From Swiss-Prot:
Main location: membrane
Membrane topology classification: Multi-pass membrane protein
Free-text comment on the cofactor: Binds 1 zinc ion per subunit.
PANTHER family: ATP-DEPENDENT ZINC METALLOPROTEASE YME1L1, METALLOPROTEASE M41 FTSH
Residues at the catalytic site: E427
Subcellular location: Cell inner membrane
Pfam families registered for this protein in UniProt: AAA, AAA_lid_3, Peptidase_M41
Keywords, alphabetical: ATP-binding, Cell inner membrane, Cell membrane, Hydrolase, Membrane, Metal-binding, Metalloprotease, Nucleotide-binding, Protease, Transmembrane, Transmembrane helix, Zinc
Binding partners and assembly: Homohexamer.
Name recorded for this polypeptide: ATP-dependent zinc metalloprotease FtsH 1
One Gene Ontology cellular component annotation held by this UniProt entry: plasma membrane
Length: 619
């Protein structure tokens, strides 16, 4: 219905513009329709007595030609000579005693109307179009004031259930209680309980906050109003507050109901800030109205406000006080079991081969959120489709993980034989040092295939399980493995290359962390010499030093000393396994990629061969 009215409502505007244009053009045509004759020809006609009358205007002279057998009476125009007062044409007219009429510049009535009307019409048309765009076709002359909230309709949409949400069990438990309250409010009220008026979902992007809200809508079987907070704020001051009032009025009429506002930090930012210049009238009016609506909830009204944000630190304290958003639900990054459960949910929609290990995929994706894992499953499905398979295998998940974490294969990357050999020794060094250290994570795969992120090779280690704590021995093992590539280059080829710069940077940062923050310094003892400021949950971290310059110099010296020790340890481990280093590097040059089982087999064969031959005899 709205789509049919929209062209009709604009038709009158088009007709009006056409009419004004016709008026303007008609005036121009009437004034400019008479022929223009050359100046000298007009003077000659006057002197021959062929002109009966003249009308003198500021910029031209209109001449009336006498009627003759050859032609009827007609009017012609002559452009006056600029800057000449007593011009020849005027003198000729006076000499021939032609009737002369002077006319001041006048515009026709219709032209004047058109000149006044056209700007007004254009301004009103522009304002009307802005109002229509602000309202996006909402009905009525003030339709743009109405709320843009979308009402969830279970009959038209595929409902999301709590069974479709995995990896965030604690947050899901909180929301299950909300759904239960909406279904049976009397059970809580009989004991004097009051459900929180507002629930704020807090978590990094992609963790499933909006999905949880949709699951609440699917389970509660009550009207569910959802919109983004940015839809409140428009260019007209006061429009956001009006939409807030409209939204909550609709929710109260439909109670019990749920209102969900996504990205609430768009209107809920702290007021004031940097002074008067930081004030945004429209956003603050919207926030004030939102606070007033939260305060206006009747205890007997079963309207629950849910909101989501990934920036809780910028929200106004008045929004978070008890009685408003008095329950905050943390939707954090999933742990190992949570990631495996999320992968299982997404894997329901794709055909999996029997040998696929989702637990291995979960171990290879620490720190990933639900959106990342959904992308991994989709990339695996695309990889299987590219090779023409009917099922998704483990190799497809490996390819998806590599594309996500390492980038695409660089098929056009051409390395010389010497560079290829050096990369093979480098990755073999990482892998063999990891095999030699009991506290190091197992090696899942080694590859010298170049990737688009700039890596010429990669050694992938997958932890056996996900731990919350790490020991000093485990940190030292990680650093030693990082330095194993550089040590292998020096041992096998006699000199190092720039390929180890990233390993060295990460190793240095990890050792500095041990010395300054973890209390693992040998020289400085138990002291935290740096602190982290920022929002750890959102990954916004900065390190602030809390020690003197002299202590900082000691920190630098200890970092260099311990890095040197671990480098020598990595080098000695490779000296003891020199045959294995050569064998693994040769296998990488030939095959490009070795799985963990192949790596262990090559290393074991080399070790058995060395034991059988025995150490070299002394001269």
């Amino acid at each position: 219905m709205a789509d049919e009215k929209r062209p009709a409502s604009r038709a009158w505007l088009g007709y009006l513009l056409i009419a004004v244009g016709i008026l303007v053009l008609s005036g121009i045509v009437r004034s400019r329709g008479r022929p223009l004759v050359p100046y000298d020809e007009a003077v000659a006609e006057v002197r021959r007595g062929e002109i009966s009358a003249a009308i003198v205007k500021p910029d031209e002279i209109e001449l009336v030609r006498r009627e003759s057998p050859q032609r009827p009476e007609e009017r012609v125009r002559v452009t006056r000579l600029p800057g000449v007062e007593d011009e020849p044409l005027v003198r000729a007219l006076l000499d021939k005693q032609v009737r002369i009429e002077a006319k001041s510049p006048q515009t026709s009535v219709w032209m004047q109307v058109a000149i006044w009307m056209l700007p007004l019409v254009l301004i009103n048309a522009a304002f009307f179009m802005m109002l229509r765009r602000a309202g996006q076709g909402a009905g009525g002359p003030l339709g743009f004031l109405r709320s843009k909230a979308k009402i969830y309709d279970r009959s038209r949409q595929d409902p999301v259930r709590f069974s479709d949400v995995a990896g965030v069990d604690e947050a899901k438990d909180e929301l299950v209680e909300v759904v239960d309250f909406l279904k049976e409010p009397s059970r809580y009220r009989s004991l004097g309980g009051r459900i929180p008026r507002g629930l704020l979902l807090i978590g990094p992007p992609g963790t499933g906050k909006t999905l949880l809200a949709r699951a609440v809508a699917g389970e509660a079987n009550v009207p569910f109003f959802s919109l983004n907070a940015s839809e409140f704020v428009e260019m007209f001051v006061g429009l956001g507050a009006a939409r807030v009032r409209e939204l909550f009025e609709e929710a109260r009429k439909s109670a019990p109901s749920i209102v969900f506002i996504d990205e609430i930090d768009a209107v809920g930012r702290t007021r004031g800030g940097l002074g008067a210049l930081a004030t945004h009238d429209e956003r603050e009016q919207t926030l004030h109205q939102l606070l007033a609506e939260l305060d206006g909830f009747d205890a007997r009204t079963t309207v629950i406000l849910m909101a989501a944000t990934n920036r809780p630190e910028v929200l106004d304290p008045a929004l978070l006080r008890p009685g408003r958003f008095d329950r905050q639900v943390i939707v954090d990054r999933p742990d190992l079991r949570g990631r495996e459960a999320i992968l299982a949910v997404h894997a329901r929609r794709v055909p999996l081969a029997s040998g696929v290990d989702l637990g291995l995929v979960a171990r290879r994706t620490p720190g990933m959120v639900g959106a990342d894992l959904a992308k991994i499953v989709n990339e695996a499905a695309l990889a299987g489709a590219r090779r023409g398979a009917r099922e998704i295998g483990q190799a497809d998940f490996d390819e998806a993980l590599d594309r996500s974490q390492l980038g695409l294969r660089r098929r056009g990357q051409i390395m010389t034989a010497e560079e290829r050999r050096r990369v093979a020794y480098h990755e073999a060094g990482h892998a063999l040092v990891a095999l030699a250290l009991p506290a190091a994570d197992p090696v899942e795969r080694v590859s010298i295939v170049a990737r688009t992120i700039g890596a010429l090779g990669v050694t992938i280690q997958v932890p056996r399980d996900e731990r919350q704590l790490v020991t000093e021995q485990e940190i030292e093992s990680r650093v030693t493995v990082m330095l194993g590539g550089r040590a292998a280059e020096e041992l096998a080829l006699g000199q190092v290359s720039s390929g180890a710069h990233d390993d060295l940077g990460r190793a240095t940062a990890l050792v500095r962390e041990m010395v300054t923050r973890l209390g693992m310094s040998r020289r400085l003892g138990l002291a935290a010499l740096a602190r982290t400021v920022g929002a750890p949950m959102l990954g916004v971290l900065q390190e602030e030093r809390t020690c003197s310059e002299a202590t900082a110099r000691e920190v630098d010296e200890e970092v260099r000393e311990r890095l040197g020790e671990m480098y020598l340890k990595a080098k000695q481990l490779l000296v003891d396994r020199r045959e294995g280093l050569e064998a693994v590097a040769e296998a990488l040059v030939l095959k490009e990629t070795l799985r963990g089982e192949e790596l262990e087999e090559i290393a074991a064969v080399s070790t058995r061969r060395k034991i059988a031959v025995g150490p070299p005899s002394a001269a």
